[in-house]
Curated annotation (Swiss-Prot):
Residues 30-47, 88-143 are periplasmic. It is a multi-pass membrane protein. Residues 1-12, 65-69, 163-174 are cytoplasmic. It comes from Acidovorax sp. (strain JS42). Required for disulfide bond formation in some periplasmic proteins. Acts by oxidizing the DsbA protein. Disulfide bonds join C39-C42, C102-C129. The keyword Ribosomal protein does not apply. This is Disulfide bond formation protein B. Signal peptide: none annotated. Keywords: Cell inner membrane, Cell membrane, Chaperone, Disulfide bond, Electron transport, Membrane, Oxidoreductase, Redox-active center, Transmembrane, Transmembrane helix, Transport. The keyword DNA damage does not apply.
Length: 174
């Protein structure tokens, strides 16, 4: 059943990287063409997508087993972090706080507060983070981000557990 993972792990990693780039491009389209402004949690999810894209791309490019596993683990961590942030934002959208304030923007928090205070403020969310401005098949952007981050994490985990064994495209060769 999982033979397709064994036969082309490099292609799967490249596909994960390409999917992340496509998601980032779609986010830019929504921001610059449609006019949706990203909230602080959306921006953090974009950084997680960049991390998954870069690390999965590096894992795909590096054929030596130790390196591809290192990059894949880092991509898995970024995907897990992105899934956490997307899940938190989805929670805020489903159960908005009683008093939703707009709060500071992402860069304002980072520039004006020490990182130890800015990070909790970002994850607390803001009034902007609870807004659902766009949906597809009943899911918000945060919901779909969670699904994609989870898919990336599962694929990366399966690749790591199976160790890239298999066919000519395998990552285990030197």
């Amino acid at each position: 059943m999982l033979n397709w993972i064994d036969t082309a792990p490099r292609r799967i990693l490249a596909l994960i990287s390409a999917a992340c780039v496509a998601m980032l491009a779609f986010g830019m389209y929504l921001q610059h063409v449609v006019g949706l402004e990203p909230c602080p949690m959306c921006i953090v999810q974009r950084y997680a997508l960049i991390g998954v894209a870069v690390f999965a791309g590096l894992a795909s490019a590096r054929g030596q087993k130790g390196w591809w596993m290192t990059w894949s683990v880092l991509a898995l961590v970024a995907a897990g972090f992105g899934a956490f942030v997307a899940a938190r934002q989805s929670w805020l959208q489903w159960y908005p706080p009683e008093i939703a304030t707009c709060g500071r923007d992402f860069y304002g928090m980072i520039e004006n507060y020490p990182i130890s205070r800015a990070i909790p403020m970002i994850f607390r969310g803001s009034g902007d983070c609870t807004a659902v401005d766009w949906t597809f098949l009943g899911g918000s952007i945060a919901n779909w981000s969670f699904v994609w981050f989870l898919l990336f994490a599962v694929l990366l985990l399966v690749l790591l557990v199976r160790g890239g064994r298999g066919a000519p495209d395998t990552l285990a060769r030197a």
